[in-house]
């Protein structure tokens, strides 16, 4: 569990465009022009994490990048919280509670890589035969305030299994 302690203001994570990692769905998405891999910035990254609770934090990701424009198509995707399922089969019991996520300045054009306040997605496992399908069982989001985030507020996004849905 990650939680505040004591009294006073919430502990604050100010990522400022740092926390850079590489997202890769493991193959093209449903349209060849959709972005399926690339670098992005997250304040909190839960990568193949389960049985975890993140509570009572203030989270921002508002970088100071010289000459970066809001309408710039190649602007970096940014999140407050990214949750990724990939190499551990079914991920259980992920709780986000009483988070104040704001001023996450992502890419307004890209809706495929994680981008926004809270964003969850599923990537192709390195060895699906061994791990099973990557998925979630028990996502709980309670009492979170998400504001001034680009592109999404809270989203359960793309999956490498997109072709199974019609």
Where are these regions (language model features)?
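A generic structural signal for short, non-catalytic loop/turn and secondary-structure boundary residues
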Residues: 6, 94, 111-113
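Right-handed parallel beta-helix/beta-spiral solenoid domain characteristic of secreted/periplasmic
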Residues: 1-70, 103-109
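Glycine-rich beta-solenoid repeat tracts in large extracellular/virion proteins
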Residues: 11, 15-16, 20, 42-48, ...
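Right-handed parallel beta-helix
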Residues: 8, 50-61, 89-105, 128-152, ...
